[in-house]
Amino acid sequence: MIEAARKAARGLARDFGEVTELQVSKKGAADFVTNADIKAEQTLFELLTKARPGYGFLGEERGMVEGTDKTHTWIVDPLDGTTNFMHAIPHFAVNIALQREGEGIVAGVTYNPITNDLFWVEKGKGAFLGAEKRLRVAARRHLDEAILATGVPFAGKPGHGQFLKELHQVSQKVAGVRRFGAASLDLAWVAAGRFDAFWERNLNSWDVAAGVLMIQESGGKITTIDESDHDVVQGKSILASNQDLHPQILERLRAA
């Protein structure tokens, strides 16, 4: 899984080096990034299906590909942070998660090839950055000390009004709110203690699958905003933080 992420990321890193030259043409840059996204997913599909021929594959670009082994599914986002990539902002990631029937997500990888931050997790064994650094959520207990990450609904996405209400409720109580543009990295950064919490609505399973397990294995809590844990991997509307901050943030979001 890690090697597949690295190989797909190598192609993205090469393509990222060319993006700046295309900024003169919005359409040119957009088409280039779309092709980079598709190429990265094709690389992941080929490598993962070769390694585990029977497993299913759910990718952002190709959708669901059924496997003969109905108990295992790869969940893949080849390029989370597409808009950042298109604007030559070095904050994006390749994401792979493995879902097992009856157990949920059992392993995952989130990799930013530009910073070489490789976050990985295995159920029951912990979450890590690189080879050795164990991830733990931040220990802050008070909202006025906390920095939160979120995602802002953009063109064509629903929920602008609700987001502004939530931002109003949350921002009055916290030390800061950040919007970096890649949900998978936001979750990894919460797991690593860089951010204290992350919330966002209208996500997809490939945005969050690896991050869900990272939060859990780093001692954090992740639920949907309505606290229905059973469908948190489906993305939708999630809140991730440490155990102490979670109810405090949830209270602010529900007041919106």
Swiss-Prot record:
Reactions that this protein is recorded to catalyse: a myo-inositol phosphate + H2O = myo-inositol + phosphate
Protein family: Belongs to the inositol monophosphatase superfamily.
Keyword Magnesium: yes
Residues bound to Mg(2+) 2: D77, D80, D207
Keyword Transport listed: no
Keywords, in A-Z order: Hydrolase, Magnesium, Metal-binding
Cofactor: Mg(2+)
Source organism, top-level taxon: Bacteria
Pfam families from the UniProt entry: Inositol_P
EC class of the enzyme, as a word: hydrolase
Documented EC number(s): 3.1.3.25
Gene Ontology terms for molecular function: inositol monophosphate 1-phosphatase activity; metal ion binding
Name this polypeptide is given: Inositol-1-monophosphatase
Positions annotated to bind Mg(2+) 1: E60, D77, L79
UniProt source species: Caulobacter vibrioides (strain ATCC 19089 / CIP 103742 / CB 15) (Caulobacter crescentus)
Annotated InterPro entries: IMPase, Inositol_monoP_metal-BS, Inositol_monophosphatase-like, Inositol_monophosphatase_CS, Inositol_monophosphatase_SuhB
Residues binding substrate, per UniProt: E60, L79, D80, G81, T82, R178, D207
Gene Ontology BP annotations: inositol metabolic process; phosphatidylinositol phosphate biosynthetic process; signal transduction
